[in-house]
Design a protein with these regions (language model features):
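Active-site neighborhoods and metal-handling regions in enzymes and metal-associated proteins
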Residues: 1-120
């Protein structure tokens, strides 16, 4: 069985057929020029205003965010094979989102350290 100190660095090369506990790596940095959501660094998030009305500019921003998110899912799916660790998927998604000028929305949401929430 693999242990946290000998998991492979390359996607698809971890032992197959069992789940092994890994090490939770530190929160990855987001480039300083990427705008942070209001919840970053706070223990709780604001409830919001429950408004479903968006300006045309806001609609375009939501569409752009959706395109980045869809691209991140496509890239993650390419390496989501037996032997790939969830941390390897997180690295790929984090870099993809940041490279597209966006903030990985789960990073530092109520202290969550990752760009991806993964279930096994």
């Amino acid at each position: 069985m693999a242990t946290s100190h000998n998991l492979p660095a390359e996607p698809g090369t971890a032992p197959v057929g069992c789940l092994a506990p890994g090490t939770i790596t530190p929160m990855r940095k987001v480039p300083a020029d990427i705008v942070r959501p209001e919840y970053v660094g706070k223990p709780t998030a604001n409830e919001g205003n429950d408004s479903n009305m968006y300006t045309p500019e806001e609609v375009e921003r939501v569409r752009a965010a959706g395109r980045v998110a869809a691209g991140a899912i496509v890239e993650a799916a390419k390496i989501a094979v037996p032997g790939t660790t969830t941390d390897q998927i997180d690295v790929l998604v984090h870099e993809y989102i940041c490279d597209h000028g966006a903030y990985p929305s789960t990073v530092d949401y109520r202290g969550y350290p990752k760009s991806v929430c993964t279930s096994l």
